[in-house]
């Protein structure tokens, strides 16, 4: 390698050294080749360097040159934006470091400001004007301290639990003469225990008429011709009152055991299905479909079961498979024998399914 030589110059104190070395010459040659490649691949840039006309005159001549110039411009702007992103990231990192350092030193300053604000609040209790604080933290801590001093204790009255006073009207309702016990039919006596099982630990909203069963319960017979007229009159009165009740009293009717026995009193010749039996028959279907029926709905289903019981009473001993299927089809419950089997599978437990399958299918 040749010895580096310094180019002759008039000013020896120039900042830029002009010592020519092989490495410097090689770098200059590479830069020149890169510039040539750039000019060769960008006709718009080459046109700007070679032509002496103005830029807007060049752009107005050829649309291809305008397009290439815009592409070059977009590339330059993209590179510049990337450079700006790196600078912004560095700036954000620097700001984050400054914030962390400020937060580390902040607790000590807050303690000093808090002690200073406490002293200022103690000195300015009698003054109506608030002191001028130098920072936002002083103002916040001063207000918090003043608010803590203004807390008040609230007095709570004691709770006294007392018994509900009983009136003489309720005592009068529980006393009945022996003659009243004779007016209770056997159907009501049979249906009342099942309804009572459905309403365990649920006090009625309305005051139901208590049914007192005295020692004369044993000699009661099923046929009481002297009381048939009274029972029909009571049934008609209960039906009339049930139809005239508003929506607000539906919950009271559902909790009233006397009102739930309307099907048994109205059609005493046919014994309806008990609510417990209905729940047992429909338990599987209701659990699979997650259906919860209210009490009033069960009483309605019990009333509708009288139609089926009446039909079975008329056809008892002579009921055939086809007649049963036809009757269910006429009611609109099923369409064919397969639907009846599916209905029995949904509503009946496994033991009853096997029994009805051996009889019908």
Swiss-Prot record:
CDD domains: CNN1_HFD (cd22574). Residues 60-84 are annotated as: Interacts with the NDC80 complex subunits SPC24 and SPC25 and with the KNL1 complex. The keyword Cell division applies. Residues 219-254 have a biased composition (Acidic residues). Residues 111-121 have a biased composition (Basic and acidic residues). Belongs to the CENP-T/CNN1 family. Present with 1300 molecules/cell in log phase SD medium. This is Inner kinetochore subunit CNN1. It comes from Saccharomyces cerevisiae (strain ATCC 204508 / S288c) (Baker's yeast).
